[in-house]
């Protein structure tokens, strides 16, 4: 089990119930948090250009936090639903695309951004397809959404001070994302051959 999977397990067992209890008093509808996540991600784009890169980073962090709590609120309030699951996975892809647009605005080369984004969209597709075929795909591969999100935040933060270092990190992240695509494809194909 990877570091982020252990952190996710710790978060879901120890932190999420407390956070969900608090947030359910603000709004018990988990879809509010799901919808707010891409709004914060979209606000990060003009924030980078017209306010400050730090404000943009904070908005992306808020977007990621909102995405991390919507499921916890749904479980805490007993409002887990197919609609919520559909909205969450769909809006996550929109948020991911907006995070990558911010990378482009920050000066990351367009080809690197495209490589990161395209691989980052294929990874969750492979999970969804694998799970629709009855396989457990969560936790397979180096760069799941948590790792990709941390990488994007790090690249953006570093780009403020040293764009060349950020470009090197983004290139490495793109390679790792595509390694994850290959890992998942190999795993799913291997399981389906059995």
From Swiss-Prot:
Residues of the active site: 92
Pathway stated in the Swiss-Prot or TrEMBL entry: Lipid metabolism; phospholipid metabolism
Keyword Membrane: yes
Transmembrane annotation, as ranges: 32-51, 58-78, 103-123, 150-170, 172-192
Localisation: Cell membrane
Entry's Gene Ontology BP terms: phospholipid biosynthetic process
GO molecular function, one term: magnesium ion binding
EC number: 2.7.8.39
UniProt-annotated binding residues for Mg(2+) 2: 67, 88, 92
Kinase listed as a keyword: no
N-terminal signal peptide: none
Positions bound to Mg(2+) 1: 67, 70, 88
Topology in the lipid bilayer: Multi-pass membrane protein
Keyword annotations of the record: Cell membrane, Lipid biosynthesis, Lipid metabolism, Magnesium, Manganese, Membrane, Metal-binding, Phospholipid metabolism, Transferase, Transmembrane, Transmembrane helix
Any Pfam family hit: CDP-OH_P_transf
Primary location group: membrane
Catalysis: reaction(s): CDP-2,3-bis-O-(phytanyl)-sn-glycerol + 1D-myo-inositol 3-phosphate = saturated 1-archaetidyl-1D-myo-inositol 3-phosphate + CMP + H(+)
GO CC term, one of those recorded: plasma membrane
Cofactor: Mn(2+); Mg(2+)
Cofactor binding mode and count: Binds 2 Mg(2+) or Mn(2+) ions per subunit.
Family, as annotated: Belongs to the CDP-alcohol phosphatidyltransferase class-I family.
Function according to Swiss-Prot or TrEMBL: Catalyzes the formation of archaetidylinositol phosphate (AIP) from CDP-archaeol (CDP-ArOH or CDP-2,3-bis-(O-phytanyl)-sn-glycerol) and 1L-myo-inositol 1-phosphate (IP or 1D-myo-inositol 3-phosphate). AIP is a precursor of archaetidyl-myo-inositol (AI), an ether-type inositol phospholipid ubiquitously distributed in archaea membranes and essential for glycolipid biosynthesis in archaea.
Protein name, per record: Archaetidylinositol phosphate synthase
